[in-house]
Amino acid sequence: MLEPVGERPQLWRAELIVKHIPRKRFGQHFLTDQGIIEGIVQAIAPRAGQAVVEIGPGLAALTQPLVERLGHLTVIELDRDLAQQLRAHPQLTVVESDVLKVDFRQLAERLQHGPVRSAGLPQAETAPKGLEPAGSSSQQGPRDWLRQTAGAAAPSRGSAVHEVTSVGAHKLRVVGNLPYNISTPILFHLLDAVDVIEDQHFMLQKEVIDRMVAAPSTSDYGRLSVMLQWRYAMENVLFVPPQSFDPPPRVDSAVVRMVPHAHPAALDVKLLSQLVQVAFSQRRKLLRHTLGQWLTARGFPGAFDVQRRAEEVPVAEYVALAQQVAAMAV
């Protein structure tokens, strides 16, 4: 076990790096480029007292500069050896768990009362104990970008809009270098808890981010684009080349900013997911061969242009169609 950090964070990180060998089964590629690290921290713009959760802290390349600005940080780490070493840091709460099993709503509720000093697993069946009061902060949200634009098209308008989000102090800011092999499941897991999240900043495979932020009528636009853009404003904020990691991955990476829309359309998310999956099941064919038949089978009486391909339909139209189909059952 490492000695407590105290006033020697650089030595603590050096010992952590020496003691750990990357594991392929966890998809571990550790960020080492200091310029990229500084760029990510600048994009996140953490403020003291904010409830920030880092997924996959690894060798603490991003963790240490974050905690220096925050005062306290909660991290989620699956690797048992890394979790053990990270616990040596007095300003970290370590949740040793698969992130897909973490209950983010419960975690947000508990962090509202201050840093969770226990490393208990915040799941529905097992809650962390030993909560302590947190220091308060009067600082406002730091993201000028959020105040200027909501980025990706909001479902209700179909084009870029100006939007300001009213954020409760208890909401989470979630960051991390996500394992590329399970990045999409993690994104959808967080979508289930989006109402308790202020924003998200993730390192991902660049081609995944290209799909996330893609506009209609482009080759990258697909199911992932629709399912995330209806709920988030998103922006690709930083390109990250393979040589920024150890070991270097075989793909380019990037950092995406995801800010939940302040006033999302009310809809049945499962129905939207099913509808979009049918639409993109044969993306090169006209929708009359896929979604059109799906709508006919449900006796849909409304008007929807199926003489298009799935990639030509804006997010707003998919959302409106899901609402109309749901209304039929009322």
UniProtKB/Swiss-Prot annotation:
Q: Where does S-adenosyl-L-methionine bind?
A: H29, L31, G56, E77, D98, N177
Q: What UniProt keywords are attached to this protein's entry? A: Cytoplasm, Methyltransferase, RNA-binding, rRNA processing, S-adenosyl-L-methionine, Transferase
Subcellular location as annotated: Cytoplasm
Q: Does the keyword Methyltransferase apply?
A: yes
**InterPro entries attached here?**
KsgA/Erm, rRNA_Ade_diMease-like_C, rRNA_Ade_Mease_Trfase_CS, rRNA_Ade_methylase_Trfase_N, rRNA_adenine_dimethylase, SAM-dependent_MTases_sf
What reaction is this protein's catalytic activity?
adenosine(1518)/adenosine(1519) in 16S rRNA + 4 S-adenosyl-L-methionine = N(6)-dimethyladenosine(1518)/N(6)-dimethyladenosine(1519) in 16S rRNA + 4 S-adenosyl-L-homocysteine + 4 H(+)
Q: Which domain of life is it from?
A: Bacteria
Task: Give the CC-aspect GO terms.
Answer: cytosol
Which molecular function term from Gene Ontology is one that the record holds?
Answer: 16S rRNA (adenine(1518)-N(6)/adenine(1519)-N(6))-dimethyltransferase activity
Q: What is its EC number?
A: 2.1.1.182
SUPFAM superfamilies reported in the protein's UniProt record: S-adenosyl-L-methionine-dependent methyltransferases
- Which one Pfam family would you cite for this protein? RrnaAD
Stretches the record annotates as Disordered: 115-158
Describe the task this protein carries out. Specifically dimethylates two adjacent adenosines (A1518 and A1519) in the loop of a conserved hairpin near the 3'-end of 16S rRNA in the 30S particle. May play a critical role in biogenesis of 30S subunits.
Which family does the entry's similarity section mention?
Answer: Belongs to the class I-like SAM-binding methyltransferase superfamily. rRNA adenine N(6)-methyltransferase family. RsmA subfamily.
Supply the name of the protein: Ribosomal RNA small subunit methyltransferase A
Name of the coding gene:
rsmA
